[in-house]
């Protein structure tokens, strides 16, 4: 699914009206019907009172139409229309006239805000501003937003929380942005929803399809995407019944050091649970017996040292190589890693300590073989990219670095971003907070390694891996909850995740 800028969404709306054709008021009616159905499904029939706050623009028009439809559905509602300049958009004005024919009370707020008395079982519908807002809320709008945020009520935002910008908020005052519990967004997610700083505004958000023209959507170009299940399922071929293990690649995992065998085991198990035909693990002598006992399906080879990697393994036999989980940063390991990168001619995955070593000389990334992937968490990427901190800055830097080095970058976190060498960014839609646990990244490395070994290109491997990793995490969270979730639980859930995708 494409993610669009605000102006592009306006153009898609306009093109939809032209292509169907459909009048703007009728398109608004369709959107309002979809929103109302979602609201009634979640909150209707429970003696709830709906307090609807509408602005003077088209988002307010949606809210007024919702008020009318809630009355038709037998729900009790009241409207507060904020119109300090007595100037409504044409469609908002039309929906006001339609609402006046109903029994729903309407309060017009001018330049002064008078706080209404709302009942305790109140559902607030926020329809003050849409995604087109390009400046901070002020005046009576800001007063109303602060009032809404102070209410002991469930807050539902239409399309986007009022005061939140569709792309970036800059220095917007958080007090003047609605803190929604639920956001019902239309057709596409907004880029701002995917930024950590905005989670407190959007709450749990859901995408509602309002039937915008597929032709209009196709015409608009974007380098931003939100990955959904159907897209990933379409990328997974059925296994040939005449195939053998050699058809699914031979993966090499370089991992582990004294006291860090667990990282190698998690990555190895994830590799085998993700379809690699063969797996060899280069690990120090101290971990050899542990690994062969824990992962009997894997082969091991010496890493040239008792406690850590000292000698880079030859890579000619393998279809992909991953290095980093539990590797350590000893001087001999650093030297061996740099030699391994120099010698390797197949796609590589770099994670964890491999990235910590590379951070000392980030230009080494330019030496990685074509089709390689790195998987930094925000702290690791900050070290690689010279200290960039905000998610927006990291995404921009990762996009630039991926293009410069012709690699794929998996920028881990909520809505993990896959930054491809062609400048696209794919945000993941699976995963949960319970996955913020030791070894979770090692598990992801194993999944990526398996997919590269099986012959997927770097972008496809990264997109599939983060989706499956998150899906397995969601399955594990269903079984065990967020607090108790471990990386081993994620590995154990991988068969279920793959099975879901194979249906």
What are these regions (language model features)?
Residues 91, 136-138, 169-170, 385-389:
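Short, solvent-exposed loop/turn segments at secondary-structure boundaries
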Residues 65-149, 289-303, 310-313, 317:
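N-terminal small/polar loop signature for handling phosphorylated ligands or for N-terminal nucleophile
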Residues 1-83, 89, 182, 193-348, ...:
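Small-residue (G/A/S/T)-rich helix-start motifs and N-terminal tracts that mark the onset
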Residues 103, 150-153, 404-407:
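A structural motif corresponding to the C-terminal end of an alpha-helix
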Residues 111-114, 160-166, 191, 306-308, ...:
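Short acidic loop-to-helix transition motifs that present clustered carboxylates
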Residues 121-123, 128-222:
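Internal gly/pro-rich beta-alpha loop/helix module
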């Amino acid at each position: 699914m494409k993610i669009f800028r605000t102006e592009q969404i306006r153009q898609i709306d306009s093109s939809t009206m032209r292509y169907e054709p459909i009048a703007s008021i009728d398109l608004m009616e369709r959107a309002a019907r979809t929103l109302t159905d979602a609201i009634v499904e979640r909150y209707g029939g429970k003696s709830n009172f709906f307090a609807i706050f509408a602005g003077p623009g088209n988002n307010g028009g949606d809210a007024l139409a919702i008020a009318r439809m809630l009355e038709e559905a037998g729900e009790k509602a009241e409207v507060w229309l904020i119109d300090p300049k007595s100037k409504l958009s044409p469609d908002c004005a039309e929906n006001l006239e339609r609402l006046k024919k109903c029994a729903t009370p309407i309060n017009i707020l001018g330049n002064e805000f008078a706080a209404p008395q709302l009942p305790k079982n109140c559902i607030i519908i926020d329809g003050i501003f849409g995604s087109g807002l390009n400046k901070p809320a002020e005046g009576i709008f800001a007063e109303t937003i602060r009032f809404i945020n102070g209410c002991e009520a469930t807050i539902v935002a239409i399309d986007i929380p009022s005061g939140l910008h569709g792309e970036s908020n800059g220095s917007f005052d958080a007090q003047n942005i609605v803190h929604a519990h639920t956001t019902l967004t239309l057709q596409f997610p907004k880029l701002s929803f995917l930024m950590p700083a905005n989670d407190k505004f959007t709450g749990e958000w859901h995408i509602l399809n309002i039937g915008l023209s597929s032709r209009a959507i196709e015409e608009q170009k974007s380098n931003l995407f939100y990955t959904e299940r159907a897209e990933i399922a379409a990328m997974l071929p059925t296994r040939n019944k005449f195939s053998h293990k050699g058809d699914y690649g031979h993966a090499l995992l370089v991992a582990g050091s004294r006291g860090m065998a667990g990282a190698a085991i998690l990555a190895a198990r994830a590799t085998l649970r993700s379809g690699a035909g063969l797996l060899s693990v280069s690990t120090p002598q101290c971990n050899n017996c542990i690994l062969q006992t824990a992962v009997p399906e894997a082969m091991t080879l010496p890493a040239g040292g008792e406690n850590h990697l000292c000698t880079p393994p030859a890579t000619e036999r393998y279809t992909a190589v991953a290095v980093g989980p539990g590797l350590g940063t000893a001087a001999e390991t650093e030297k061996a890693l740099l030699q391994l990168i120099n010698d390797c001619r197949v796609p590589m995955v770099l994670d964890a300590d491999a990235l910590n070593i590379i951070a000392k000389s980030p230009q080494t990334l330019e030496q990685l073989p074509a089709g390689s992937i790195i998987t930094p968490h925000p702290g690791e990427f900050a070290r690689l990219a010279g200290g960039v901190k905000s998610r927006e800055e990291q995404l921009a830097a990762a996009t630039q670095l991926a293009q410069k080095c012709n690699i794929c970058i998996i920028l881990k976190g909520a809505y993990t971003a896959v930054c491809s060498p062609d400048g696209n960014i794919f945000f993941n839609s699976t995963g949960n907070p319970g996955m913020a646990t030791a070894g979770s990244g090692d598990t992801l490395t194993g999944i990526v390694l398996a997919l590269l070994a099986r012959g997927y290109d770097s972008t496809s491997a990264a997109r599939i891996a983060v989706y499956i990793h998150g899906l397995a995490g969601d399955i594990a969270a269903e079984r065990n909850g967020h607090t108790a979730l471990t990386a081993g639980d994620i590995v154990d859930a991988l068969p279920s995740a793959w099975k879901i995708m194979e249906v």
